UniProtKB/Swiss-Prot annotation:
It holds the Pfam family Tubulin. This is Cell division protein FtsZ. It comes from Methanothermobacter thermautotrophicus (strain ATCC 29096 / DSM 1053 / JCM 10044 / NBRC 100330 / Delta H) (Methanobacterium thermoautotrophicum). One of its GO terms (molecular function) is GTP binding. Homodimer. Polymerizes to form a dynamic ring structure in a strictly GTP-dependent manner. Interacts directly with several other division proteins. GO terms for cellular component: cell division site; cytoplasm. GTP binds at G48, A49, G50, N51, N52, G135, T136, G137, E166, R170, D213. Residues 7-17 have a biased composition (Basic and acidic residues). Its main location: cytoplasm.
């Protein structure tokens, strides 16, 4: 181990290059190459929830991405914070919003297709964030995703499903919108809002919406900065594309820990997250973002990856990155995006057949639960 200790001491003594070295011709040339080759990433937040996400990203910062707020409601758009803003459907809605009707939101996006194309020009990767169930986000997100994908960008939609408290109508709107979104984007990361209440059941609804916005923002920031921010283990755009291109549905799990065996605790928390409440054994692949302060070790990161790999098919493609964030102060944070999953929120191309299959599986489970309960009662009496 002596050679390792010697190497550490030498690295600590090593000085940064002088300013004259940094300003050399070769460094300027390298900097120019890096700037020109950097993936162009846009985060489009459409509708109320989408605008909240880009506003939150503007507050916490997302390195290497531009934010674009899109809305049919001029007032909501005015109060949003983003690098760029786009009011869609001026003739259809007149800046007054879509009235909670997805068909109106879709019509507004179609009216403004040329404007949307201009905003997305030259993008390598586009995130489209929205809350499903209302008018603008549900209606416009599939149109925006389709235009981004047609322009050649890797297109990742990140969408929330509504709380049950929002009513059956919004739920039905959300399910129809999700089906359209799946057809339009490369990957759709679904965040079921009801699952947030399993973590904090007594959370007031307004606070629950804020938590949903935070999770949307963290998901987008985590994936983006795996590409744009240098790390302990860095990824490039091609790495992320290999997982997310044409992957269909995806779910996300998050966990963090600071005491004991923090690496294992954080990954188990992420895998057991209510947001990732489904069988992932047949998933196509996983994207793992590991963050920690300067005491994060490569061994800890590798243990996290090994645990995730054990849960997936041996042929699944796993890409991971590790980043140092000093503000975490002894905390390890693990974010897992599992792509190519069968989601309970959409039934895919075979619709009713798959729905019947899932319902039959649930009936079998209920039957087993009832028989176990009967045995328990018989044993007691």
């Amino acid at each position: 181990m002596k050679f390792i200790n010697d190497a550490i001491k030498e690295s600590e003594k090593r000085e940064k290059p002088s300013s004259s070295s940094m300003n050399s011709e070769i460094d300027r040339e390298l900097r120019e190459i890096i700037e020109n080759s950097r993936a162009k990433i846009y985060v489009v937040g459409t509708g109320g929830a989408g605008n909240n996400t880009v506003t939150r990203l503007s507050e916490i910062g997302v390195e290497g991405a531009e934010t674009i707020a899109v809305n049919t409601d001029a007032q909501d758009l005015f109060y949003s914070v983003a690098n760029r803003k786009l009011l869609i459907g001026k003739n259809v809605c007149g800046g007054l919003g879509a009235g909670g009707v997805p068909e109106v939101g879709e019509e507004c996006a179609e009216e403004s297709e040329d404007d949307i194309r201009r905003e997305l020009e030259g993008a390598d990767m586009v995130f489209v964030t929205c809350g499903l169930g209302g008018g603008t986000g549900t209606g416009s997100a599939p149109v925006i995703s389709k235009l981004a994908k047609k322009a050649g960008a890797l297109t990742i939609a990140v969408a929330t499903m509504p709380f049950s408290a929002e009513g059956l109508k919004r739920r039905e709107n959300a399910e129809r919108g999700l089906e359209k979104l799946q057809s339009a984007a490369d990957t759709v990361i679904v965040i079921p809002n009801d699952k947030l209440l399993e973590v904090a059941p007594n959370l007031p609804l307004n606070k629950a919406f804020m938590v949903a916005d935070e999770i949307l923002g963290r998901a987008v920031k985590g994936i983006t900065e795996l590409i744009t921010k240098p790390g302990l283990v860095s990824l490039d755009f091609a790495d992320v594309r290999s997982i997310m291109k044409g992957s269909g549905m995806a779910m996300i799990g998050m966990g963090e820990a600071e005491s004991g065996d923090r690496a294992l605790e954080s990954v188990y928390e992420a895998l057991n997250s209510p947001l990732l409440d489904l069988d992932i054994s047949n998933a196509r692949g996983a994207l793992i973002n590991i963050s920690g302060s300067s005491d994060l070790t490569l061994q800890e990161a590798e243990r996290i990856v090994e645990v995730v790999a054990e849960e997936l098919d041996p042929d699944a493609n796993i890409i991971w990155g590790a980043q140092i964030q000093d503000e975490l102060q002894n905390v390890i944070r693990t974010t897992i995006v599992v792509a190519g999953v069968r989601s309970p929120y959409i039934y895919g191309a075979h619709g009713s057949a798959e729905k019947e299959f899932l319902e039959e599986k649930q009936r079998e489970k209920d039957s087993v639960d009832e028989s176990v309960l009967e045995e328990f009662i018989d044993g007691v009496f």
